[in-house]
Amino acid sequence: MILASEDIGLAASGVLLTSVAAAQSVALVGMPEAQIILAHATLEASLAPKSNSVVKAIGAAMTDVQRGRVGTVPAYLRDAHYPGASELGHGQNYLYPHDEPSGVAPQTYLPEELLDAGYFQPTNHGAEERLGAVADRLRRLRQGESLD
């Protein structure tokens, strides 16, 4: 399971599911039949494309937290369901993504101080290439770009 998340990651996310299923199946089936299950999971993991973008992203985010680079939650994302919240600007100007034609609001959710962080740096390995394109599209929509 560690290999599936740490070394394969988003390049082939299904390998994590196979790893978990294999661990559970081995516990249920036992040896000698479990060797087939283990071989199945091992072969899938060894043949899968590799990416450590998840490891790098969480590492960069944790470094920012440790250095105190965390910022503040934008006012429009703060709870507005208590007396006095509106006077503080909480919840005002929030754009509901479901009301947007693209399903993505032209609004950021990170603190201002972290907008340039770019934690997720996708590779072009396996399925991660497609996820990188999705992340780029979402970023552009959140910045208010029209993608027509």
Give the positions of each predicted feature.
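Terminal-proximal interaction/regulatory segments of ATP-powered molecular machines
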Residues: M1-V104, P111-D148
